[in-house]
């Protein structure tokens, strides 16, 4: 299976452990960054990882930030993505079986690496259980977003914000 991964500057170390874990299980990993602890914007990497799934280049996605909240929200802005923020294996299973989630987000600073690995295993092994009710729910979710043609696949989409950051336009932590 091809898995698209991405993270923010808070958890690149966790992302690399997850990448190695996935590879050890025989998966191909598309790493969308970030690669270091230099302050950056999580929407860049949530969007990049999600677009690989939406385009069909990857089968599923795993994204991480400190809590998983921000990066899951950014991934969910990509048409065709159903990203679920998960902190336990039961939620991972539910997200896949009933909502056909194609991306999971995990908080790398609040969830231990062993549990993250278990969550990923359950998510990858779970199978969607199509029912009329599930299909109607998913259809409704998928119809909530209309892609801005200037956004999808546009690697320069965040340039304005990055320039503002580089020029001191945002407060440093």
Swiss-Prot record:
Transmembrane segments: none annotated. It is an enzyme of class 5 (isomerase). Its EC number is 5.3.1.26. SUPFAM superfamilies: Ribose/Galactose isomerase RpiB/AlsB. Pathway: Carbohydrate metabolism; D-galactose 6-phosphate degradation; D-tagatose 6-phosphate from D-galactose 6-phosphate: step 1/1. It catalyses: aldehydo-D-galactose 6-phosphate = keto-D-tagatose 6-phosphate. It holds the Pfam family LacAB_rpiB. InterPro entries: LacB, RpiB_LacA_LacB, RpiB_LacA_LacB_sf. One of its GO terms (molecular function) is galactose-6-phosphate isomerase activity. This is Galactose-6-phosphate isomerase subunit LacB. It comes from Clostridium acetobutylicum (strain ATCC 824 / DSM 792 / JCM 1419 / IAM 19013 / LMG 5710 / NBRC 13948 / NRRL B-527 / VKM B-1787 / 2291 / W). The gene is lacB.
């Amino acid at each position: 299976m091809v898995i698209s991964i991405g993270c923010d500057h808070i958890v690149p170390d966790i992302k690399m452990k997850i990448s190695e874990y996935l590879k050890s299980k025989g998966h191909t990993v598309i790493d969308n960054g970030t690669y270091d602890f230099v302050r950056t914007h999580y929407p860049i990497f949530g969007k990049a990882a999600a677009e690989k799934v939406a385009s069909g280049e990857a089968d599923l996605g795993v994204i991480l930030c400190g809590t998983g909240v921000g990066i899951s929200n950014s991934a969910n802005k990509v048409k065709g993505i159903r990203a679920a923020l998960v902190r336990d294996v039961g939620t991972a299973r539910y997200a896949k079986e009933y909502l056909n989630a194609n991306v999971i987000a995990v908080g790398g600073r609040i969830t231990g690496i062993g549990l993250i690995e278990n969550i990923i295993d359950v998510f990858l092994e779970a199978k969607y259980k199509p029912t009329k009710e599930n299909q109607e729910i998913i259809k409704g979710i998928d119809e909530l977003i209309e892609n801005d043609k200037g956004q999808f696949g546009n690697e320069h989409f965040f340039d304005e914000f990055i320039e503002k950051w580089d020029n001191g336009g945002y407060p440093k932590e």
